[in-house]
């Protein structure tokens, strides 16, 4: 029971996400349940132990732009770049896919390295 609880806590703390809204206020989401909360934002920061992904959202048309920094593994960098390119080309509104695609896919990617 203790081991299971520790594992759940580790999973919740594995990902750190921050939103910034138009006025500059920053919101920190501590677990995946909070990712489904809809709020205005322009920047999404995803921090892993070895790298940080920043997703910027243009508030006029909600098209995502991305930058990846601090990646040690070149394969991880390539996969993340391709993934965000796909989002940029195929999604006109990022809000509905945040907790479905972004969280689960990138979290799984990060665990491999």
From Swiss-Prot:
Q: What else is known?
A: Partially overlaps PRM9 and YAR029W.
Instruction: Return the protein name.
Output: Putative uncharacterized protein YAR030C
What lineage, starting at the top, does this entry show? Answer: Eukaryota, Fungi, Dikarya, Ascomycota, Saccharomycotina
